[in-house]
A protein has these predicted regions:
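Solvent-exposed, non-transmembrane regions of integral membrane proteins
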Residues: 1-641
Length: 641
């Protein structure tokens, strides 16, 4: 996929020969060399004892030594593969990988321009590279968000972002690339930040290669839930990385003396000063992320035993929240500053109304939505509040700049529109990640999960799972939920129909979570169902269920009880109130019936009536069971002693 997109981009680059002039030669040299290196990954040739690549077309009998493969008709004994993991059977996984790999492939073009510029000692490529760099950042960002959408819908990581090393591997190149775009803009206007632009455009591609090494080498096996295992190509992957890293940095250091920039210092009130600050903040953010992600690499190289953070998400969040605050503010004020210098009077005049509107909107957000995240202390909670204000400021200030300063001209508003989109995403992340609420708190004291599920399943916390019985309305937070029925389709996917009814109104809706039979015959995999509102989403998924296709092995636990006595069960007591003799007047005269009149009382004080009995008809004795579905109880009258 990477090689395919690389070929497509290479063909497009070739059409720019007349426009780019001599620059095209250096760019195509790098693009072609990258393509050759990619091609070696799928060659599958042995050079002495070294295997170069792994061919996707190799036959099973050429790779394995199983005796059955010596038979000419061995294919009739080979069954189809198990296919995709059930969690990957999602429409987002059809479009996410192609878009993401297009983003990876596109980082080659800015890198190729940087290499060509260093080789030729020319810096006139900045105008040509900018559209490619913005395209690359846009596509790579889109691919990342598609992956987030998949994680959000499938709830594989408890949300759309979990700071998993494989997620970080795509985010870090994007951060550095965006930093490079901003320093490139500075160079075009002022002739400064040239060295930083070379560094950032080079690193964006090299970090893609490093990310490939991390995810494909198996080194992240203990820290990532969806990294690949060792594919037997570690030496080649490392060589692929070093063959670009060493020459590029060697060439960059060698050419530093030729990268001339004006010696004058930027004014603190200038746009270029704060653009550079923002670029450096993005770069430092990337450094922190990749450093934490690379802990297994450091341990491997230096023989250390540095432990990864116990709470990886918070280890990143406690740093990145301040990055979000700074970037939110800089995207807001940056365009109100002029290149070279800005008068304080003019700046205050332009920024005054955006600040006022931001204060009003922030107050509305805090009042109607709020932030309910106190797990990490008041300091982090305060940072979240500031982050929401900063993101709101970014949206409002850029909207004001677009309509007041640019008079609503879309052609001139690329930066404003981009910043509005980015800060809207930032605001959504801060609000949604800070307001996760569990509706299904289990207050019964009965865990619906097996012990191994409760410990190992990230969605298997017993306190966050309640048992629903068919046809029984159950309290769940702001809603009363009824499990109405379930259906099974032809692909072994079982859908559960759940009716949610708001307690304070008559509003109700249906959700259909499903479970899909695991293709390795190891149980089921859950897919959530969701209800989307403008300000919230409600997710529901099935952690476990009673498979009616299997034999019920539940056994009764006998108890001896007298009238007025009570016995305990896991969630309360069962009292025998009375014994009724032939309570049914319409019963046949030849039959005799005994019915136990019992009261089931739960820990919550809820009472249920139960009437198990025995019926003697002629010489046949029948047991009459009674079920208390809300308490998962089945009562049987066995005998009189």
């Amino acid at each position: 996929l990477w090689s395919f997109w690389h070929s497509v981009l290479g063909l497009i680059v070739m059409t720019k020969a007349k426009k780019w002039g001599k620059n095209i030669n250096g760019v195509m040299m790098v693009v072609n060399f990258v393509q050759v290196c990619l091609a070696t990954m799928i060659v599958g040739l042995y050079i002495f004892d070294f295997k170069l690549g792994s061919s996707p077309f190799i036959l099973l009998r050429h790779e394995m030594t199983w005796p059955i493969l010596s038979r000419p008709d061995y294919l009739q004994f080979v069954k189809d593969g198990t296919g995709l993991n059930t969690t990957l059977q999602n429409y987002w996984m059809v479009i996410h990988p192609p878009v993401l790999f297009l983003g990876f492939a596109s980082t080659t073009i800015p890198f190729a321009f940087a290499v060509a510029g260093l080789l030729k000692k020319e810096n006139n490529w900045m105008d040509s590279v900018l559209p490619w760099a913005t395209f690359s950042a846009g596509i790579l960002g889109l691919g990342i968000m598609m992956g987030d959408a998949w994680a959000y819908e499938s709830l594989n990581f408890g949300g759309y972002w979990a700071w998993d090393p494989v997620e970080n591997a795509s985010l870090v190149p994007w951060l550095v690339l965006v930093a490079g775009i901003h320093t490139c803009l500075i160079y075009r206007k002022k002739g400064t930040s040239l060295k930083a632009t070379y560094l950032f455009f080079g690193l964006s591609f090299l970090l893609v290669l490093y990310s490939t090494f991390l995810t494909r080498s198996g080194i992240l096996g203990d820290t990532s839930v969806h990294a690949f295992t060792d594919l037997g190509m570690n030496a080649q992957l490392l060589g692929y990385l070093l063959i670009f890293v060493i020459p590029y940095f060697g060439l960059l250091i060698y050419r530093l003396k030729d990268l001339k920039e004006p010696q004058e210092e930027d004014e603190i009130s200038s746009r270029e000063f704060w653009m550079l600050v923002g670029s450096l903040v993005l770069f430092l953010s990337a450094v922190v992320i990749i450093a934490i992600t690379s802990i297994p690499v450091f341990n491997k190289i230096f023989g250390t035993k540095i432990a990864p953070p116990e709470d990886p998400a918070f280890a990143h969040n406690q740093v990145q929240i301040f990055v979000a605050i700074i970037i939110g503010i800089l995207t807001a004020i940056g365009q109100y500053l002029k290149f070279k210098a800005t008068s304080a009077e003019n700046f205050i005049k332009n920024i005054k109304w955006p600040l006022i509107v931001t204060a009003v909107l922030s107050a509305i957000i805090f009042y109607f939505i709020g932030i309910a995240y106190e797990e990490k202390g008041i300091g982090y909670l305060g940072a979240l509040y500031v982050g929401v204000v900063a993101a709101t400021f970014g949206i409002v200030a850029n909207a004001f700049y677009w309509f007041n300063i640019l008079k609503g001209k879309l052609k001139s508003a690329a930066a404003s529109v981009g910043h509005i989109g980015f800060t809207m995403v930032l605001l959504g992340i801060l609000i949604s990640s800070s307001n996760k609420t569990v509706l299904s708190w289990n207050t019964t004291g009965i865990s619906p999960l097996k012990e191994d599920n409760a410990k190992n399943n990230p969605t298997g916390n017993p306190r966050e799972n309640i048992t629903l019985f068919e046809g029984v309305e159950t309290d769940m937070g702001k809603y009363m939920v009824t499990y109405q029925r379930d259906t099974l389709d032809g692909l072994d996917k079982r859908f559960f129909e759940l009716n949610f009814k708001e307690k304070k109104s008559d509003h109700s809706f249906l959700l259909y979570p499903d479970v899909l039979k695991n293709n390795k015959m190891e149980g089921f995999s859950a897919n959530p169902s969701s209800k989307h509102y403008w300000n919230k989403d409600i997710f529901v998924y099935v952690t476990s269920f009673q498979d009616h296709s299997e034999e019920d092995t539940t056994s009764f636990k006998p108890h001896q009880i007298a009238i007025g006595d009570s016995i305990f069960y896991s969630n309360g007591t069962i009292k025998l109130d009375n014994v009724l003799i032939n309570p049914n007047p319409k019963a046949a005269s030849s039959s005799n019936e005994l019915v136990l009149q019992m009261t089931v009382t739960s820990k919550e004080g809820l009472k249920y009536e139960a009437k198990p009995g025995i019926l003697l008809e002629g010489m046949t004795l029948n047991q009459e069971l009674d079920t208390v579905k809300a308490q998962n109880l089945v009562l049987s009258f066995n005998k009189v002693v």
